[in-house]
Regions:
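Beta-rich accessory regions
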Residues: 3, 18-20, 254-484
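Beta-rich carbohydrate-recognition and catalytic domains
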Residues: 1-103, 107, 111-167, 172-218, ...
Length: 484
C-alpha cells in the first residue's frame, strides 16, 4: 500500500470500522510482538512524550499514527505505571483536532501544576500551500484524564528560525520554570533555545537566548532536546541531525547524543564547563530519548527504539516501534550511566546458570561476567546453524561488537549491520535483555549501552556460546502480558 500524503493526513474520523478491524487483524499476525517492552496498540509508535509523575502515577505518552506503520497524522496515547515496568494504556489523550494542531500533535513534555498535568507540545499545522507552521501549544489533563486545550500559541515560530522548530521541554530549576525548544536557524544550522516562564505562568514564555552548550553548529537540526539534572549537574540530551562525523562518529541515520555540564547558568542561557559530545547508545536504534527529574530527584529516561526514515520488517503487519526500558541516569567518573530501574528485577520468574540453550522463549535477561584479557562470542536468537544476533566481547583489545547480519529479516543495511564501542581491558559485566524483537545491552551496569531491533526467523530462539568461557545467570522474564 502506498502511503500518499492524502492517506497519511486523512482525518481520524474518516477511517471506517472495517479498515480499523483489518489493521488489528493484520497486526495480530505479526510474529514480532514484544512481551515486556511498550509497543503500539496499532500502527506506529515513535517519540516518548510527557514523561512525568502525576496523581501518584508515572505517566508517559507515545506519539502514534494508529492506521499503519507510517508517519502520518500524529496523536498522543497515554500510558501509566506504578513501577515504571508495567504500563497500562489509558487511551488517546491528545488528538490533532484544533486549528493549532490540525496536522499532528508532535513531541513535547509535561509538568504538574496544581491538580492538573500541563502538556507542552508542538502543534503541526499545514496551510493551503502545504507550508508548515509549528506552534508550541499546551493542554491540561485533570486527574480523571480529561483534556482541556489552551486556546492560544504559547511560543510562536521565531523570526530567525525555519519551520523546523519543535519539541518543547519544560523543567524546573531552583523553583523557576524554564523550557527549551529545538530548532533550525535561517542558515540551516541547529540550535536549542531557552525560555523562561514569566511569574512561573506556563502560558507566558519569554526567550532568554540560545542555549550555550558549545554547539559545534554542524548539525542542521536539533531534535528532542532535554535538559535534565543528574545530581547537581546539567545533562543535555539531544538528536543533532546531520552532525558532522568528524565531530563524533556514528553509524545510524540520525544520532542521539549528550553533553554534561558542571552547572547551569539560566540567566545567561549557559551550561558551564561542558563535556565532550558522547553517544547515548551504541546500538542500531535509540532515538528521541526523553528524560525528566522525578519528585525524588532521580533522573529517569526512556527512548524510542526506532528511527525516522527507516522501513522495518514489521511494517507489513501494520506496526512499528517500541519503547526502551525505563532507565535511571547517574554520573560516574564524568560518564553518563544508564541502567534499567530496579523494578525490572520483579520480572525475573526463574534463574539458572548461563549455558548454551537449544531453545528459549526469547524473553529473558542474562547477567554475564567476562574475565579480563578474555575473548568471548555469544549468539542470541540462534538457530541450529548458530546464526543469530552475535555479541563479541574482546577484552584483549577493549571492544564490544554487536552483529545482526544473521539475525532474521534484514533492513537498513545501508547503515551497516554491526555496531561497536570501546571499553576498558578489564573484567566486565553485561546485562542483556532479549524481548522477541528487541535487545538492550548494558555494559558495566550502564557505562555503555547498545539497543536495537531484530526480526528473527521462527527457528531463531537459542543461545550459543561460540567462543570463550563467559559465566553468569539466565533469568526467564514474565511480564504477565500475553504475546503471540
Amino acid at each position: 500500500m502506498e502511503w500518499t500524503t492524502e492517506r497519511r493526513y486523512r482525518l481520524y474520523q474518516d477511517w471506517t470500522q472495517e479498515e480499523i478491524q483489518n489493521i488489528k487483524e493484520n497486526m495480530a499476525q505479526s510474529p514480532w510482538h514484544t512481551h515486556y517492552h511498550v509497543e503500539p496498540k496499532t500502527g506506529l509508535l515513535n517519540d516518548p512524550n510527557g514523561f512525568s509523575y502525576f496523581d501518584g502515577k508515572w505517566i508517559v505518552f507515545y506519539q502514534n499514527f494508529p492506521f499503519g506503520a507510517a508517519h502520518g497524522l500524529k496523536s498522543w496515547v497515554q500510558l501509566e505505571s506504578d513501577d515504571l515496568v508495567h504500563f497500562t494504556e489509558t487511551g488517546v489523550k491528545v488528538l490533532p483536532d484544533t486549528p493549532l494542531d490540525s496536522h499532528g500533535a508532535y513531541s513535547g513534555s509535561a509538568m504538574q501544576f496544581g491538580d492538573n498535568l500541563f502538556l507542552f507540545y508542538t502543534g503541526n499545522v499545514r496551510d493551503e500551500n502545504w507550508i508548515r507552521h509549528p506552534y508550541q501549544i499546551g493542554a491540561l489533563m485533570d486527574k480523571d484524564g480529561k483534556i482541556t486545550k489552551i486556546d492560544k500559541i504559547l511560543i510562536d515560530q521565531p523570526a530567525d528560525s525555519t519551520d523546523h522548530f519543535r519539541d518543547p521541554q519544560i523543567f524546573n530549576f531552583k523553583g523557576q520554570y524554564y523550557a527549551i525548544v529545538g530548532g533550525q536557524d535561517l542558515e540551516k544550522k541547529g540550535f536549542v533555545r531557552l525560555y523562561k516562564a514569566i511569574d512561573n505562568d506556563y502560558t507566558n514564555w519569554q526567550a532568554v537566548g540560545d542555549l550555550d552548550f558549545a554547539n559545534d553548529r554542524t548539525a542542521y537540526m536539533m531534535e528532542c532536546p532535554n535538559l535534565v539534572f543528574v545530581g547537581e549537574q546539567p545533562v543535555l540530551l539531544y538528536c543533532p541531525q546531520g552532525l558532522d562525523k568528524d565531530v563524533l562518529d556514528y553509524d545510524n541515520i540520525y544520532p542521539n547524543m549528550y553533553k554534561i555540564g558542571t552547572s547551569f547558568d539560566p540567566e545567561n542561557a549557559k551550561m558551564v564547563d561542558v563535556s565532550q559530545l558522547q553517544n547515548m547508545d551504541y546500538g542500531f536504534e535509540a532515538y528521541a530519548t526523553q528524560a525528566f527529574n522525578a519528585p525524588d530527584g532521580r533522573a529517569l529516561s526512556v527512548s524510542w527504539l526506532g528511527l525516522p526514515d527507516i522501513a522495518y520488517p514489521s511494517d507489513r503487519f501494520d506496526h512499528q516501534g517500541t519503547f526502551s526500558l525505563v532507565k535511571e541516569l547517574t554520573i560516574k567518573d564524568g560518564k553518563l550511566y544508564q541502567y534499567p530501574v530496579a523494578a525490572i528485577k520483579e520480572l525475573r520468574a526463574s534463574e539458572e546458570p548461563f549455558s548454551n540453550r537449544a531453545q528459549t522463549n526469547n524473553t529473558y535477561e542474562l547477567e554475564l561476567n567476562l574475565e579480563a584479557n578474555s575473548q568471548s562470542e555469544i549468539v542470541f536468537l540462534a538457530d541450529k546453524e548458530g546464526k543469530g544476533l552475535s555479541i563479541n566481547f574482546d577484552l584483549v583489545n577493549g571492544q564490544v561488537t554487536v552483529d545482526r547480519s544473521q539475525a532474521g529479516e534484514q533492513y537498513a543495511q545501508e547503515f551497516g549491520t554491526t555496531r561497536s564501542c570501546l571499553i576498558d581491558k578489564q573484567a566486565t559485566t553485561a546485562n542483556i535483555f532479549i524481548d522477541k524483537s528487541v535487545f538492550e545491552i548494558f555494559i558495566n551496569k550502564g557505562e555503555k549501552v547498545f539497543s536495537g531491533r531484530v526480526f528473527p526467523h521462527a527457528d531463531q530462539n537459542g543461545i550459543l556460546i561460540k567462543s570463550g568461557k563467559p559465566t553468569g545467570i539466565y533469568y526467564e522474564l514474565d511480564h504477565g502480558r500475553k504475546t503471540n
